[in-house]
Amino acid sequence: MAFTGKFEMESEKNYDEFMKLLGISSDVIEKARNFKIVTEVQQDGQDFTWSQHYSGGHTMTNKFTVGKESNIQTMGGKTFKATVQMEGGKLVVNFPNYHQTSEIVGDKLVEVSTIGGVTYERVSKRLA
């Protein structure tokens, strides 16, 4: 399934618990709770540019090639080396503290992250 598109967050589950386990402070968790997140994905074969635009003008962009080590930035702002894999149509990556999958389901981008038994799910609807 092609990932290229622009997606706006419409729902999330277990936000507070997941962010606390990541070590994000309560004030930052509260501040970010109502952020409108727009994710833009450009896919060219195995090459991806994955950008998340947050309320207030902050943007985080990761560029990676499936199967090759890349510098990846986490939700918490830390950068590390990781290899993104494609497994059954899902992008899969192991961050230092959590595991994440991303997939297209119908016209939705579904991102699932797991840490310490807590699963955070963010669902975004396709805008373009």
UniProtKB/Swiss-Prot annotation:
It holds the Pfam family Lipocalin_7. The modification N-acetylalanine is found at A2. PROSITE patterns: FABP (PS00214). Induction: Isoform 1 is up-regulated by chenodeoxycholic acid (CDCA) via the FXR transcription pathway. Isoform 2 is up-regulated by NF-kappa-B and in all stages of colorectal adenocarcinoma. Isoform 1 is not up-regulated in all stages of colorectal adenocarcinoma. GO terms for cellular component: cytoplasm; cytosol; membrane; nucleus. Isoform 1 is expressed in the jejunum, ileum, cecum and ascending colon intestine. Isoform 2 is xpressed in the gallbladder, duodenum, jejunum, ileum, cecum, ascending, transverse and descending colon, sigmoid colon and rectum. Isoform 2 is expressed in colorectal adenocarcinomas and their adjacent normal mucosa (at protein level). One of its GO terms (molecular function) is lipid binding. Keywords: Acetylation, Cytoplasm, Lipid transport, Lipid-binding, Membrane, Transport. The keyword Manganese does not apply. The keyword Membrane applies. InterPro entries: Calycin, Fatty_acid-bd, ILBP. Forms a beta-barrel structure that accommodates the hydrophobic ligand in its interior. Can bind at least two ligands per molecule, however, the stoichiometry is debated. PANTHER family: FATTY ACID BINDING PROTEIN. Binds to bile acids and is involved in enterohepatic bile acid metabolism. Required for efficient apical to basolateral transport of conjugated bile acids in ileal enterocytes. In vitro binds to bile acids in the order: deoxycholic acid > cholic acid > chenodeoxycholic acid and respective BA conjugation modifies affinities in the order taurine-conjugated > glycine-conjugated > unconjugated bile acids. Stimulates gastric acid and pepsinogen secretion. Belongs to the calycin superfamily. Fatty-acid binding protein (FABP) family. This is Gastrotropin. It comes from Homo sapiens (Human).
